[in-house]
């Protein structure tokens, strides 16, 4: 690149920066006036406030309600993203497991004979961890209890040990069903609500800010024109007010369309249906597994009818005959 071309390019860049700075500088008085106006309105010092169309304010209220519902539900259903929500004890167990893992690696490192071997020990993955859920904890404790009974009485059949083993298997299956429920809720409920909050409602919030910002600027321009005491400025102030009035009307129209789109896409009944379906499938699976376990492991035997002693039968007959004679 020649020096002249470089100089020309540099001059152009400097001109663009100068223009940008000039524009920002010109905006400062307007921004200061808008900020002052906003404070005055909040303090009740200004009552001449341009009213937004009723259709628009009703749309704002509807979108606020949708946003409130989404946020309130997510405040609860976000718990499904924490696998141990039904087993808080796992925190202590995780600390103990981490300590054991560190101790094990330190022991292995003391026996390493080379730097590469030590590196392999450090990067080697740890044991596969079971999900820290209540059902998995029940499955584990039932399995351990079954093994203890079998070791204590190796030559005897242990119905309780067998029942514990079956209970362990059932709890593991229920744990898997719960994890499946959590995954469905995360992907088909939480994710959908968050995406709408981030994109559609986020876009609507920006449009609403533009409307209220433009309304402030328009009201400032109206006030400036009304309070003007210099005839030579009246024409320019009127043009400024009319320009801002048109811009205010345009951003309000654009925001109205945006708010309507949010409302039309907010099919929360379908989201609620997905949440209920995930829960129903989990509850049905869990109930079915538990009923099957109870039926197989604790089948109730029919109660035996009490036998009537032979010597009591004639006595009963005699008693009845005595009543007839009476």
Swiss-Prot record:
The modification N-acetylserine is found at residue 2. Its main location: Golgi. Keywords: Acetylation, Golgi apparatus, Isopeptide bond, Membrane, Phosphoprotein, Ubl conjugation. The keyword Membrane applies. One of its GO terms (biological process) is establishment or maintenance of actin cytoskeleton polarity. SUPFAM superfamilies: BAR/IMD domain-like. Residues 299-326 are annotated as: Disordered. Pfam families: BAR_2. GO terms for cellular component: cytoplasm; cytosol; Golgi membrane. Present with 7721 molecules/cell in log phase SD medium. This is Protein GVP36. It comes from Saccharomyces cerevisiae (strain ATCC 204508 / S288c).
């Amino acid at each position: 690149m020649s020096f002249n071309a470089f100089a020309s390019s540099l001059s152009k860049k400097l001109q663009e920066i100068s223009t940008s700075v000039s524009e920002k500088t010109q905006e400062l008085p307007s921004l200061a006036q808008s900020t002052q106006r906003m404070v005055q309105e909040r303090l009740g010092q200004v009552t001449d406030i341009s009213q937004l169309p009723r259709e628009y304010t009703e749309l704002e209220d509807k979108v606020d309600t949708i946003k409130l519902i989404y946020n309130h539900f997510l405040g609860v259903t976000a718990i499904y993203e924490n696998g141990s929500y039904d087993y808080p004890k796992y925190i202590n167990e995780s600390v103990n497991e981490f300590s054991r893992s560190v101790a094990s690696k330190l022991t292995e490192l003391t026996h390493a004979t080379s730097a590469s071997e030590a590196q392999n020990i450090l990067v080697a993955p740890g044991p596969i961890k079971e999900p820290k859920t209540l059902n998995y904890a029940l499955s584990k404790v039932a399995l351990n209890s079954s093994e203890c009974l079998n070791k204590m009485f190796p030559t005897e059949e242990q119905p309780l040990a067998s029942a514990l083993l079956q209970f362990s298997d059932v709890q593991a299956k229920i744990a898997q069903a719960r994890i499946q429920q959590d995954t469905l809720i995360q992907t088909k409920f939480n994710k959908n609500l968050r995406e709408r909050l981030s994109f559609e409602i986020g876009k609507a919030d920006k449009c609403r800010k533009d409307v209220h910002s433009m309304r402030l600027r328009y009201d400032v321009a109206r006030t400036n024109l009304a309070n003007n005491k210099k005839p030579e400025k009246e024409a320019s102030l009127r043009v400024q007010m009319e320009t801002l009035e048109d811009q205010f009307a345009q951003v309000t129209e654009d925001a109205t369309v945006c708010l309507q789109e949010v409302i039309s896409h907010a099919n929360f009944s379908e989201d609620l249906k997905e949440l209920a379906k995930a829960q129903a499938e989990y509850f049905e699976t869990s109930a079915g597994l538990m009923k099957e376990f109870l039926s197989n492991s604790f089948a109730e035997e029919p109660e035996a009818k009490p036998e009537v002693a032979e010597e009591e039968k004639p006595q009963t007959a005699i008693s009845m005959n005595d009543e007839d004679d009476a």
